[in-house]
Design a protein with these regions (language model features):
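Helix-turn-helix-type domain boundary/helix-start signal
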Residues: 4-5, 64, 246, 576
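Extended alpha-helical interaction scaffolds
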Residues: 463-465, 471
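A conserved structural/catalytic subdomain of Rossmann-like adenosyl-cofactor enzymes
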Residues: 97-98, 104-107, 111-461, 475-478, ...
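Conserved S-adenosyl-L-methionine
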Residues: 5-122, 127-129, 138-143, 148-150, ...
Length: 666
């Protein structure tokens, strides 16, 4: 993962989704990465295109890379992914110095034939130095200008733009400085806007790239756009932490891609379609915060409510989406003091919210929308597992979920999509196995190979598709329960040892039947002490109980070991003898039930968040400044009374007298 050639999978996937969508109606496509690195961008585009085209065999890949070892990695990765060598064209060279025309060596000028493709994708090195000398007439740069020699970002961008066909598309990762830096870059940016080439700008989260915290964007460019707007997306807030870096989640990628596809006028705090006239008004500055404000509202304090109490209507209005969804709830929870402030009039806020008819109706509507979704999934995934198109099935299911959520307020459809994607990862693997190896693969078990002392050895078995734990919980629950009971008893014995240790005196803990750390009994020494009969009766009673525990523990450990081995071996046999119907039931439990459980939890998550926000607003002004002042006064009076009872020498009493003055006493 060297930073100079590694593009995070999620960024690569995002760019690929945009490109694949643009090229979805084409029978064959050619794609080119002029700074190919490991080849991940090209590989992901092939996968995404397969969803629309039915096969990635209709894709021809072009790649150019400066560093020889990385160039070799590109070709190797493409071949290892099953891509035909006939569909791979790679070059080892400097993209900016050695453009990719085809020509005959003996007549390069008259036989010049530049490469034009359907899509160019790239993640070039950021702000790299280059040599613009004598390149003014180069066809890649002549219409737009030359990037400054200290920053080649726009040189790479113009190279990419030049190499697409008139109906092609470019996606390129760049440092965000290209959006607003002046000089030669400002000129190029102006020309790109005037030529109507910039289709979209996507601001990425900070620290998303390995080894650098440079803020980055993805710019989408086209040659023959029909509209002159630029879609600006601020995706900087959607991510999860992954060690020291930030990582786009599946829901973040889909939210961005959907915004690109739909090109909305505005999505609050996320995206906006910006006219060319507005960009010109801003002197061609494309800095994202000029067009999309994704900042969170700063918390403020209402001075009136802080002094006199009450809940400001203005702050309740911040929850307007909930009041719209639950039109009668607000009146049931609050009574007005005046036109601007109100009081909470229920004792238990959470119960009042959850039991209100509007909220009950909301949960019922969700249940109705997804009431038959389990059956829908069973029909699609279980009944149709051998014939469905696994590459496009997740997208089809996401459309179904979005359609069911269309009339359900408050539930974030992208949160639902994330649940689907989390589940889909295991489903997709299983489907690939079943479709390529046959349904019999579901009844297969494989040797569980582990590494021991630098050698691979077998340690039991694993289900090829069906996990042992799942099969045991469904088909062998009595045996599992018996084994778990013994394991539980072993845990209890460990706790009993600790209790008996606590009962010993410090003198007893110095005896040989307790170890040097004084945190465990020594089994052999316990037996000796019992036999010697040289301890107090109370201690003897403890030692006999401990000795009995040692015996019970030894027996249980052997039973657990033997039972576990027997259960494991029997599970292997159960999987191999499953009927087809039993397999389908187990797949339903593995694939569908967890997804349904997670989806059905979404309304509760919405309501929990609502109650949490509402409770915070109500408690914010529970104690007024007047209450605080009264508490301070009461405390001062109490302290004055205590001071009156104090006695001391002359100097102590003078000090106490002065303190009483400060506290408002005589």
């Amino acid at each position: 993962k060297a930073g100079e050639f590694y593009t995070p999978h999620e960024v690569s996937l995002l760019m690929s989704e945009i490109v694949a969508y643009h090229l979805k109606d084409r029978e064959k496509i050619q794609i080119y990465d002029p700074t190919s690195g490991s080849g991940s961008l090209l590989i992901n585009i092939g996968k995404c295109a397969a969803r629309y085209m039915g096969s990635d065999s209709k894709v021809r890949y072009y790649a150019q890379e400066l560093k020889e070892n990385t160039y070799n990695l590109t070709r190797m990765n493409l071949v290892m992914r099953g891509i035909s060598a006939d569909d791979i064209v790679t070059r080892n060279g400097d993209t900016l110095e050695e453009d990719w025309p085809y020509f005959e060596e003996n007549d390069p000028v008259n036989t010049y034939d530049p490469l034009f493709v359907d899509a160019v994708v790239s993640n070039p090195p950021y702000s790299q130095a280059w040599n613009p000398t004598d390149k003014e007439s180069n066809p890649r740069f002549s219409q737009y200008g030359l990037a400054p020699k200290g920053k080649a970002d726009y040189a790479f961008l113009l190279h990419d733009l030049y190499h697409i066909r008139n109906d092609g598309i470019v996606t390129i990762v760049l440092p965000h400085g290209v959006l607003f830096r002046g000089g030669e870059e400002g000129t190029i940016r102006k020309n790109l806007i005037d030529h109507n080439n910039i289709d979209a700008i996507i601001g990425l989260p900070a620290n998303i790239f390995f080894g650098t915290g440079i803020p980055t964007i993805i710019m989408v460019l086209r040659k023959n756009k029909q509209d002159s707007d630029v879609l600006v997306i601020d995706a900087s807030k959607g991510f999860e932490k992954d060690g020291k870096t930030n990582k786009l989640r599946a829901c973040d990628i889909k939210r961005i891609v959907d915004a690109y596809k739909e090109r909305p006028e505005k999505i609050e705090k996320f995206a906006r379609r910006v006219s060319r006239a507005e960009i010109i008004q801003n002197d061609y500055n494309l800095n994202i915060p000029r067009y999309v404000d994704s900042s969170e509202k700063a918390e403020s304090w209402d001075i009136y409510a802080s002094m006199f109490g009450g809940i400001p209507e203005a702050e309740l209005q911040d929850l307007s989406a909930y009041w719209t969804a639950f039109p009668h709830l607000k009146a049931a929870l609050f009574s007005p003091d005046n036109e601007a402030y109100c009081q909470l009039n229920v004792q238990n806020l959470k119960n009042a919210v959850l039991n209100h008819p509007d909220v009950v109706a909301f949960k019922t509507a969700f249940q109705n929308a997804f009431g038959d979704f389990d059956a829908y999934l069973k029909s699609a995934l279980i009944d149709g597992m051998m014939r469905l198109n696994a590459a496009g099935e997740e997208e089809r299911l996401s459309r179904e979920i979005f359609a069911r959520l269309a009339e359900i307020p408050l539930v974030d459809r992208y949160a639902a999509y994330q649940l689907l994607d989390d589940d889909w990862k295991k489903i997709a693997i299983d489907l690939e196995i079943i479709q390529t190896e046959g349904f019999a693969a579901t009844k297969q078990v494989d040797p569980n190979m582990v590494l021991k002392k630098d050698a691979e050895v077998q340690d039991g078995w694993v289900g090829h598709v069906l996990p042992f734990e799942l099969v045991q919980s469904v088909k062998m629950h009595e045996e599992v329960a018996a084994l778990r009971a013994k394991e539980t008893r072993l845990s209890e014995i460990a706790g009993e040892y600790e209790s008996y240790l606590d009962e010993l005196s410090e003198e007893d803990k110095e005896q040989n039947f307790v170890n040097d750390a004084k945190d465990a009994f020594v089994a052999a020494e316990v037996k000796k002490a019992i036999k010697a009969r040289e301890v107090e009766p109370a201690t003897m009673s403890i030692l006999k109980d401990v000795d009995a525990l040692f015996a019970e523990e030894k027996t249980l450990k052997k039973q657990v070991k033997d039972d576990s081995a027997a259960l494991h071996q029997r599970t292997k046999g159960v999987i191999e003898r499953l009927t087809d119907e039993e397999v389908r039931d187990l797949l339903h439990r593995k694939w569908i039930l967890p997804l349904m459980e997670n989806l059905n939890s979404l309304p509760d998550a919405v309501l929990d968040d609502f109650v949490k926000q509402l409770d915070a607003v109500c408690k914010k002004y529970e104690t007024t400044f007047e209450d605080v002042e009264s508490q301070i006064t009461d405390t001062e009076h109490e302290l004055l009374g205590l001071l009156d009872d104090l006695q001391g020498n002359e100097f102590d009493m003078k000090g106490i007298a002065e303190l009483k003055k400060l506290l408002g006493g005589e």
